[in-house]
């Protein structure tokens, strides 16, 4: 039986962080299709315009144009149930709570790694 292709939306404004996340996703077995958005506004557009729903959204916190909290709220406001995992270098309880309140399903800290993403993929049954 063939493994399901995993579609991920990676929302991150820093190119180096996108490169690291993409490599970690591939190493963890979850990088079949990775679309990128450099800010929250583009992320909302990508989710809205996607031909098929994403299996996972990795959402940065601080970005220009629209931050991760607002993008998460807007995606949830569209009725999208795709797991959203907040990603930030700030792991303060207030930051985690703000993302969860906005509609995120989980939180992980930067830098992303094969191990961290492996746990996330397993949690959402994508591995």
UniProtKB/Swiss-Prot annotation:
Consequences of knocking out this gene: Dwarf, narrow leaf and low tillering phenotypes.
PROSITE patterns given in the database record: RESPONSE_REGULATORY
Q: Which domain of life is it from?
A: Eukaryota
Q: Can you tell me which residues the record assigns to a coiled coil?
A: none
Instruction: Kindly list the positions at which 4-aspartylphosphate occurs in this protein.
Output: 60
GO process terms (BP): cytokinin-activated signaling pathway; phosphorelay signal transduction system
To which protein family does this belong?
A: Belongs to the ARR family. Type-C subfamily.
What is the protein name stated in its UniProt record? Two-component response regulator ORR41
Q: Gene for this protein? A: RR41
